[in-house]
Design a protein with these regions (language model features):
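Short, basic/aromatic recognition patches
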Residues: 1-28
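Charged, gly/pro-rich active-site loop segments
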Residues: 2-7, 89-178
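A generic structural signal for nonpolar/aromatic side chains embedded in well-ordered alpha-helices
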Residues: 21, 75-76, 126, 154
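Short gly/pro-enriched beta-turn/loop segments at secondary-structure junctions
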Residues: 22-24, 79, 146-149
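Short beta-strand segments
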Residues: 24-68, 84
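Broad gene-expression machinery/nucleic-acid interaction feature
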Residues: 26, 40-42, 81-83, 101, ...
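Structural motif
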Residues: 51, 61, 81, 109, ...
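Helix-adjacent hinge/juxtasegments
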Residues: 64-66, 71-99
């Protein structure tokens, strides 16, 4: 599955790529859709450091929530392979004919959670990210919606991050100064 990044100097460290995933408020989940065509859907998410040991090891987990039926759920049920891309910076620089960007892409396996404890863990993580410090109202919302919402777990097997070479150059200069 892994391919070497062509522009290696623009590659983010694993820790920086995780930070990009944490900071992003939305991304695009890519699945295999009907007739083998890609299906990509914008969606809110939360990155967690949960992982398994042993042969099923993965490097992080991303949670999403969704309606219980629809194209996204059908696609997940048909194929567990997926990717998820986020962009936290996308600054157009007209004078340089470029953009200053910072992004990350996760590749792994996705599934709809059945266990209520796992579903609650995912919904609580989403609530804390998007409504920090509102635990009481979040619990009320979650308990009222639990039977009507699907919670999706994306087990990240590979994570890569990339940034514009201009940003990489700035960061390299800054670290030499320190």
């Amino acid at each position: 599955m892994h391919r070497q990044m062509r522009r290696i100097k623009q590659q983010l460290s694993h820790e920086a790529a995780v930070q990009v995933m944490r900071e992003a408020t939305s991304g695009v989940l890519a699945l295999e859709g009907d007739d083998g065509y890609p299906y990509a859907v914008p969606i809110s998410h939360v990155w967690t450091d949960e992982c398994l040991g042993g042969e099923d090891e993965f490097i992080g987990r991303i949670y999403f929530h969704s309606a219980c039926e629809g194209y996204k759920i059908d696609s997940i049920m048909d194929s567990e392979k997926a990717s998820f891309a986020v962009v936290v910076r996308d600054e157009i620089v007209p004078d340089e004919y470029t953009t200053y960007f910072k992004s990350a892409i996760a590749t792994g396996r996705v599934h709809v959670l059945e266990d209520d404890e796992e579903r609650l863990r995912g919904l609580r993580a989403l609530a804390e990210k998007y409504n920090p410090g509102q635990q009481e109202s979040a619990e009320k919302e979650i308990s009222g919606a639990l039977s009507r919402v699907a919670v999706i777990a994306f087990e990240v097997e590979e994570l890569t991050g990339k940034q514009a070479r201009e940003l990489a150059s700035r960061e390299a200069k800054a670290s030499r100064v320190e």
